UniProtKB/Swiss-Prot annotation:
GO biological process: positive regulation of translation
Entries under CDD domains matching the protein: EF4_II, EF4_III, LepA, lepA_C
Origin organism lineage: Bacteria, Pseudomonadati, Pseudomonadota, Betaproteobacteria, Neisseriales
Catalytic reaction annotation: GTP + H2O = GDP + phosphate + H(+)
Function: Required for accurate and efficient protein synthesis under certain stress conditions. May act as a fidelity factor of the translation reaction, by catalyzing a one-codon backward translocation of tRNAs on improperly translocated ribosomes. Back-translocation proceeds from a post-translocation (POST) complex to a pre-translocation (PRE) complex, thus giving elongation factor G a second chance to translocate the tRNAs correctly. Binds to ribosomes in a GTP-dependent manner.
Topology relative to the membrane: Peripheral membrane protein
Gene3D superfamilies recorded: 3.30.70.240, Elongation factor 4, C-terminal domain (3.30.70.2570), Elongation Factor G (Translational Gtpase), domain 3 (3.30.70.870), P-loop containing nucleotide triphosphate hydrolases (3.40.50.300), Translation factors (2.40.30.10)
Protein name per UniProt: Elongation factor 4
Gene: lepA
Length: 597
């Protein structure tokens, strides 16, 4: 056991985490050159394209160190994006150490800081590594100083490497052996193994990635999941080198995969503890949480007969992504669809893209919303995540909205812009700290302002230099109202929004004018109105297309022309009574782009 090292890599998006992992695998001979694809551990196409890691993957590598001993290095790959922070904390809790990989030209970013604090809280040894030192812009001294100023760990003489060209990779491996402690645990104690990740395989069902903390797990053992109490039998055990290699048993300190008869991902929850039925552990390992959805959106098929196909597709995605929640929903404007819950906006985009790419679906997505707590005058408390489900204004005592604490790291020259943006979004400044060239701003922001377009605006106002990390803080009472959009006097439920009273009128006007551009002109006038309750706050008209009925009249009496124009008017009026308006997909997307300027 003393020769095992379990570690993961913490890094911001694009700081070279997956490339470094590839180099480790190549160096330790886990795959031969023919099998090396770039980013071996990122197995979903979308992970490679966006350059982000979503699911945790592992590799068990044998490394012959300079002291002549062979060490087993278990690399657990972690996601770096803020939406997947729970997965990160699970991956980290399975390790004794973490490599903090920082781009030597860019320096420290907010998500790195957040994940690093998570690691330190979990008592994991953090080893700083400077990557991309072969770039002309690399400035190792400045970045070492930044790591010390911002994160507060000693970074003098941090290992320098370039994962792309392979310089210094061996030094990093030596550093892992030297600095990261060996796992502790008792092979003979009752089994406690934490599920780091789980995914669905078409042939064997659910594959779980486990880290054995105490005890030993063998083939054919009966095991129990402690949070769901489900029991099942071990059918396969093994490790990934990243190819899967079967083993007879896994002992304390090891990381490997476990396949049982479980067919549903919901039973093998990430962070849960596995124990033996015959000799169970008294209590589970700490840190397990049920995943909470933060952002909700409606997904509707463009063709209504694709409804069942969409249900199948969502169920298949759910097999691999336990944090995706969905339930059927009916909208008057869009027909049958699903209300889905996501971890954050990136998660929403990824799910949408996977549905379109892997399952060939054509979708309409409504504007993302968050959960509100509504206290009724009767004293009852309800949760509302869909604006069209908000009860009548008269029966509401207060509406509480979720507030998040956002940590923003930004270079000094952009601080003013970022603070202005946060104030526009009704943010309250909590803290501001200067660290070298960077400034760390802490704000309490309403979540519904963040889901709209905060991230894009933050990037554009800081020329891409600001980075953001956020976590939920609490529900706070707020002056919120429901904004309805009416087309031709009829409410379109899918376009309703919950907004703050201050920005309602402005938001309504902007939406109405945007809708006017997007709704195709019909044979009759269409009125687009924004309303709060029964009060109309904005109106735009989509002008009718009309034929020139006077084209055939040359000269002659004015009454003839009047008669033709009146006849045309009467026809348009009749049309308007029976006509209905198709609202294009672009109009639903417009809501997302309407900004609070």
């Amino acid at each position: 056991m003393k020769n095992i090292r379990n570690f993961s890599i913490i890094a911001h998006i694009d700081h070279g985490k997956s490339t470094l992992a590839d180099r480790f695998i190549q160096y330790c001979g886990g795959l031969d050159l023919r099998e090396m694809s770039t980013q071996v551990l990122d197995s979903m196409d979308i992970e490679k394209e966006r350059g982000i890691t979503i699911k945790a993957q592992t590799a068990a590598l044998n490394y012959k160190a300079r002291d002549g001993q062979v060490y087993q290095l278990n690399l657990i790959d972690t996601p770096g994006h803020v939406d997947f922070s729970y997965e990160v904390s699970r991956s980290l809790s399975a390790c004794e150490g973490a490599l903090l990989v920082v781009d030597a030209s860019q320096g420290v970013e907010a998500q790195t800081v957040a994940n690093c604090y998570t690691a330190i809280d979990l008592g994991v040894e953090v080893v700083p590594v400077l990557n991309k030192i072969d770039l002309p812009a690399a400035d190792p001294e400045r970045v070492e100083q930044e790591i010390e100023d911002i994160i507060g760990i000693d970074a003098v003489g941090a290992v320098q490497c370039s994962a792309k060209s392979g310089i210094g990779v061996e030094d990093v491996l030596e550093e892992i052996v030297a600095k990261i402690p060996a796992p502790t645990g008792d092979e003979n104690a009752p089994l406690q193994a934490v599920i780091v990740d789980s995914w669905f395989d078409n042939y064997v069902g659910v594959v779980m990635l486990i880290r054995v903390k105490n005890g030993t797990i063998k083939l054919k053992d009966k095991v129990r999941f402690m949070s769901t109490k489900a029991e099942t039998q071990v059918e396969q055990l093994g490790v990934f080198t990243p190819k899967s290699v079967q083993k007879q048993e896994l002992k304390a300190g090891e990381v490997g995969f476990l396949i049982t008869g479980v067919k549903e991902l919901g039973q093998a929850k990430v962070g849960d503890t596995v124990t033996l039925v015959a000799n169970p552990a008294t209590e589970p390992l700490p840190g397990f949480q049920e995943v909470q959805s933060q952002v909700f959106a409606g997904l509707y098929p463009v063709e209504s007969h694709d409804y069942e196909a969409l249900r199948d597709a969502l169920e298949k995605l759910q097999l691999n992504d336990a944090s995706l929640k969905f339930e059927p929903e009916v909208s008057q404007a869009l027909g049958f669809g699903f209300r889905c819950g996501f971890l954050g906006l990136l998660h929403l985009e990824i799910v949408q893209e996977r549905l379109e790419r892997e399952f060939d679906m054509d979708l309409i997505t409504t504007a993302p919303t968050v959960i509100y707590e509504v206290v009724l005058k009767s004293g009852e408390k309800i949760e509302v995540e869909n604006p069209s489900k908000l009860p009548d204004i008269g029966s509401i005592e207060t509406i509480l909205e979720p507030i998040i604490t956002a940590t923003i790291l930004v270079p000094q020259e952009y601080v003013g812009n970022v603070m202005t943006l946060c104030n526009q979004k009704r943010g309250v400044q909590v803290n501001m700290q200067y660290m070298g060239r960077q400034v760390m701003l802490t704000y309490d922001l309403p979540m519904n302002e963040v889901v709209m377009d905060f991230f894009d605006k933050l990037k554009s106002t800081s020329r891409g230099y600001a980075s953001l990390d956020y976590h939920f803080k609490e529900f706070q009472p707020s002056d919120l109202i429901k904004l309805d959009i009416m087309v031709n006097g009829e409410k379109v439920d899918a376009l309703s929004l919950i907004v703050h009273r201050q920005s309602a009128v402005h938001r309504g006007r902007e939406l109405a004018s945007k809708m006017r551009e997007l709704i195709p002109r019909q044979m009759f006038d269409i009125a687009v109105q924004a309303a709060i309750g029964s009060q109309i706050i904005a109106r735009e008209n989509v002008k009718a297309l009309r034929k020139n009925v006077l084209a055939k009249c040359y000269g002659g009496d004015i009454t003839r022309k009047k008669k033709l124009l009146e006849k045309q008017k009467a026809g348009k009026r009749r049309m308007k009574q029976v006509g209905n308006v198709e609202i294009p997909q672009s109009a639903f997307l417009a809501i997302l782009q309407v900004s609070d300027k």
